[in-house]
UniProtKB/Swiss-Prot annotation:
Zn(2+) 2 binds at residues 103, 105. Belongs to the small heat shock protein (HSP20) family. GO terms for molecular function: amyloid-beta binding; metal ion binding; protein homodimerization activity; protein-containing complex binding; structural constituent of eye lens; unfolded protein binding. This is Alpha-crystallin B chain. Lens as well as other tissues. Residues 148-174 are annotated as: Disordered. Heteromer composed of three CRYAA and one CRYAB subunits. Aggregates with homologous proteins, including the small heat shock protein HSPB1, to form large heteromeric complexes. Inter-subunit bridging via zinc ions enhances stability, which is crucial as there is no protein turn over in the lens. Keywords: Acetylation, Eye lens protein, Metal-binding, Zinc. May contribute to the transparency and refractive index of the lens. The lineage of its organism: Eukaryota, Metazoa, Chordata, Craniata, Vertebrata. One of its GO terms (cellular component) is mitochondrion. GO terms for biological process: apoptotic process involved in morphogenesis; cellular response to gamma radiation; lens development in camera-type eye; muscle organ development; negative regulation of amyloid fibril formation; negative regulation of apoptotic process; negative regulation of DNA-templated transcription; negative regulation of gene expression. The gene is CRYAB.
Length: 174
C-alpha cells in the first residue's frame, strides 16, 4: 500500500491569516466559486484557491447596507431582495431602528435555504423617531428614512483672539 507523505511546510500557506484555520474565522454564507469545486493538484497550496485574498466576497453583490446622514435627512438602505414585505419588520426601540427579516426553509435552484437577519442602527439625535418611514423598492432595497430637524441656531463666525502667553508652560515661540 502506497502512502503519500506531504511536507507540512509546503502545504502550509505563506500568509496563514488569509486562510481560515478555525471555525470562527470562516465566512459562512459565501457562495462556492466554480474553481473551488474542481480538484486541485497536491503540489498547489490550498492558499491559492481558498484564500479570501483571491476571492470576491458575495457581500459585494448582495446584502449591502448603507446609512446616510445628509443635511436634511437620515436614511438607511438595505438589500433585502430575498425577503417579501411580509417577512420583514422595521421597528423603533428607544434610540435604535431594528430591521429584522426571516423566511422559513424553501427550495431554490441550489437546494433548500432558510434565512434570518437582524440589523440595528442608531437614530441621530436630530431625528424625530415618529417621522421614520420605510419603503421597499422593486429590486429589493429597503429604505428607512426620516427628515432631520433644522437647527434653530443661526450660523455665525467666531473671531480668533491672539494671546500673549504660550498654551504649554515652558515653551517659547521661535
Amino acid at each position: 500500500m502506497d502512502i503519500t507523505i506531504h511536507n507540512p511546510l509546503i502545504r502550509r500557506p505563506l500568509f496563514s491569516w488569509l486562510t481560515p484555520s478555525r471555525i470562527f474565522d470562516q465566512i459562512f454564507g459565501e457562495h462556492l466559486q466554480e474553481s473551488e469545486l474542481l480538484p486541485t493538484s497536491p503540489s498547489l497550496s490550498p492558499f491559492l484557491m481558498r484564500s479570501p485574498f483571491f476571492r470576491m466576497p458575495s457581500w459585494l453583490e448582495t446584502g449591502l447596507s448603507e446609512m446616510r446622514l445628509e443635511k436634511d435627512k437620515f436614511s438607511v438602505n438595505l438589500d433585502v431582495k430575498h425577503f417579501s414585505p411580509e417577512e420583514l419588520k422595521v421597528k423603533v426601540l428607544g434610540d435604535m431602528i431594528e430591521i429584522h427579516g426571516k423566511h422559513e426553509e424553501r427550495q431554490d435552484e441550489h437546494g433548500f435555504i432558510a434565512r434570518e437577519f437582524s440589523r440595528k442602527y442608531r437614530i441621530p439625535a436630530d431625528v424625530d423617531p415618529l417621522t421614520i418611514t420605510s419603503s421597499l423598492s422593486l429590486d429589493g432595497v429597503l429604505t428607512v428614512s426620516a427628515p432631520r430637524k433644522q437647527s434653530d441656531v443661526p450660523e455665525r463666525s467666531i473671531p480668533i483672539t491672539r494671546e500673549e502667553k504660550p498654551a504649554i508652560a515652558g515653551s517659547q515661540r521661535k
